[in-house]
A protein has these predicted regions:
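Extracytoplasmic
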Residues: 109, 171, 246, 290, ...
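Active-site lumenal/periplasmic loops and adjacent helix-entry segments of GT-C-fold
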Residues: 18-157, 184-185, 190-194, 373-379, ...
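Membrane-helix boundary/interfacial segments in multi-pass membrane proteins
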Residues: 30-44, 66-70, 137-151, 242-267, ...
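Start-transfer (signal-anchor) and selected internal transmembrane alpha helices
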Residues: 1-28, 349-358
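Membrane-interface transmembrane helices that cradle and orient dolichyl/undecaprenyl
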Residues: 157-174
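Membrane-interfacial loop-to-transmembrane alpha-helix junctions, especially the N-terminal start
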Residues: 8, 123-126, 171-174, 214-219, ...
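Signature aromatic-anchored transmembrane alpha helix within multi-pass, membrane-resident enzymes
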Residues: 219-226, 339-367
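Transmembrane catalytic cores of multi-pass membrane glycosyltransferases
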Residues: 41, 55, 147, 185-285, ...
């Protein structure tokens, strides 16, 4: 067993152990809806799974924002996957955790069995899974409850290995499985689907140079894959201009966005991960004799350069992809090409250095993850007091003024209310579902009461708000503006207009 082999085994063991530790900790999600604002996207996911059951797909649903059309802007694949578990268990949070476990299990099996077409040894496949799923970014993605995104990575990885397999051989019928894989990636998390398109484009360029007939097959497969998303993507495109999703500036960050805070993980990763990819890919080319790798990687290479430079922020559609998604994409590429470097062709001292770096980076990513990514939290007594007030709500309500004092926010309560109390609200957790003007009016009610009582009352009438939940000093402001006190629990209060 060579030194690099021993190193890969040790690194894989450490990272997979860390994955298991995080999955065990994540089982706390089954205890019920978290009410904090710390690293939680579950506030947007479990209510929509509930909406799928009670309202249906692409149907009017009254619970959020004075009524929404379900899944008009939400990729639905994970919800369809989770729905049977929700029906069987009759518990959103048990179903949520089951799908988390299955995504990691299915990803491991896909890498182990499908990955062997390009990663020949078991250790290579084990290491690939460990590097892709045991790193700081993926563990943060799990901690933030982003199961639809993790579901998309599962399909991207399958697609990646299929594409790599046919890059160097004639296309046969199994290749066309890429069409549903591409569709499922988009329908799970469209940002990941966009990145898969760049790998697809690399294959198209290779085939265009080598065999134009096969290039046409690749293009038609991609078109078919996107076509399979038509039941969701066409309604989205038709409605997009009326939704906040078309006006949001959220997405990829540039290193200059962190002026004065360059020691933050994100700006460091924006520079270090692309540099790592460039170095690893160079070493891969140096130790392998394939002629089409540069052509294949060119679209992804360009994308990574744009991301590293910050120019990605100026490119339509792509600029809406969050930085963490780019990070995982780059980690997948780094992992694959690292595991295919023929270290025997490199200087012995370099191979020793590589072994040391792999161990240092493995320990480093676990340490960073433990430091930056807190363990899963449960509701505090103060947060439960706010949620308990929902038992006394009998009209359309909003959270007035915010809940930062108790490390919660209106999103958490708007997610909790329909699931546990069957309540409707003028607010919601998924702003992409409404237009910008509506959200601006809503923010006036969510804000720290920077408007007059008259303006506050006017916005309440406009959004059909009849009751307010508030906390601490915000309760005093509601009283000052003439609202009627209905109930207090601790420092939490419920007022009527």
């Amino acid at each position: 067993m060579t030194k690099i082999t021993k190193t890969l085994f040790a690194a894989s063991l450490l990272l997979i152990s860390y994955v298991l530790f995080r999955l065990v900790d994540y089982s706390k999600v089954m205890l019920g809806h978290p009410l904090s604002n710390i690293y939680h996207d579950i506030h947007g996911y479990t209510p929509q799974l509930f909406f799928l059951k009670v309202c249906g797909f692409h149907q009017s649903c009254p619970y959020w924002y004075n009524g929404i059309k379900t899944f008009i802007a939400t990729p639905p694949a994970w919800y369809f996957f989770a729905y049977p578990f929700y029906i069987i268990t009759n518990n959103l949070f048990i179903a949520f955790y089951i799908t988390a476990i299955l995504i990691f299990l299915f990803s491991f099996l896909a890498i182990y069995y499908i990955g062997k077409i390009k990663l020949k040894s078991r250790l290579q496949r084990l290491a690939f899974f460990a590097f892709v799923f045991g790193n700081n970014v993926t563990m943060l993605t799990l901690r933030m409850d982003r199961l639809p995104e993790l579901f998309a990575w599962f399909f991207l990885i399958i697609s990646f290995f299929i594409i790599l397999h046919y890059k160097d051989r004639e296309i046969a019928w199994p290749f066309y499985l890429l069409a549903p894989m591409y569709a499922l990636t988009i329908l799970s998390y469209h940002g990941v689907g966009i990145l898969l398109s760049f790998i697809f484009l690399g294959l198209f360029l290779v085939k265009l140079i080598e065999n134009k007939t096969e290039a046409i097959k690749v293009a038609l497969t991609g078109i078919l894959g996107f076509g399979l998303t038509a039941f969701w993507s066409i309604p989205l495109l038709l409605e997009a201009r009326n939704l906040f999703i078309s006006q949001t500036s959220l997405g990829a960050e540039a290193w200059w966005d962190f002026a004065g805070n360059y020691l933050h993980f994100t700006p460091i990763a924006i520079i270090i991960l692309p540099l790592g990819f460039f170095i690893i890919f160079y070493l891969y080319l140096k130790t392998n004799e394939k002629t089409n790798d540069l052509i294949f990687i060119a679209p992804s290479f360009l994308l990574i350069v744009l991301f590293m430079s910050g120019l990605i922020k100026f490119i339509p559609i792509i600029k809406t992809i969050f930085s963490n998604i780019f990070f995982i994409f780059i980690i997948i590429l780094i992992s694959y090409y690292l595991l295919n470097i023929k270290f025997g062709k490199l200087n012995t001292n370099f191979a020793k250095l590589a072994s040391v770096l792999i161990i240092v980076l493995t320990i480093g990513t676990i340490a960073i993850s433990m430091y930056n990514t807190p363990l899963y939290d449960t509701a505090t007594p103060e947060q439960r007091n706010v949620a308990e007030l929902l038992n006394y709500v009998d009209e359309k309500f909003i959270i007035a003024g915010g809940l930062r004092e108790i490390k919660s926010n209106h999103h958490a309560i708007y997610a909790y209310a329909p699931i546990y109390n069957n309540l409707t609200t003028a607010g919601g957790q998924y702003p992409a579902l409404k237009d910008f003007q509506y959200l601006e009016d809503l923010d006036a009610l969510h804000g720290n009461f920077s408007v007059s009582c008259e303006v506050f009352s006017s916005f309440s009438d406009k959004l059909n708000v009849k009751q307010y939940i508030a906390y601490g000093k915000n309760c005093d402001w509601l009283s000052y503006c003439g609202a009627k006190l209905d109930k207090t629990i601790g420092k939490a209060c419920l007022y009527s207009k």
